[in-house]
Regions:
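Flexible "arm" and connector segments at domain edges
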Residues: 1-98
Length: 98
């Protein structure tokens, strides 16, 4: 099930607004703080089964939360092409390695 990251980021933002994490007028820095919060949770996650998502470990769930928070942030700052940004960043790392 492939979904364009831009569309997924829009859905992440909608859910964040619906559950009260942000409002339509919130500064993008609120989403940036959420990345930090989710990252700290991931650092404490275990490899054991998640209580929220029983088919996944706490570490997998935590990593997904960090990604969702990051996509929400990119959406909030108006990133137009998330896929291109990620590919460009990966290519930068590849060039720096070679």
């Amino acid at each position: 099930m492939a979904i364009p990251l831009k569309k997924f980021a829009e859905q992440c933002e909608e859910v964040a607004i619906a559950n009260g994490k942000i409002t339509p007028l919130s500064s993008p820095s609120v989403s940036l703080h959420d990345i930090s919060r989710e990252w700290r949770k991931l650092c404490n996650a275990t490899p054991y089964k998640s209580l929220n998502l029983p088919n996944w470990s706490e570490k997998e769930e935590g990593a997904a939360e960090v990604i969702i928070a990051a996509l929400t942030y990119l959406q909030r700052i108006g990133c137009k092409d998330i896929e291109k940004l990620l590919w460009a960043n990966l290519e930068l790392h590849r060039r720096q390695t070679l």
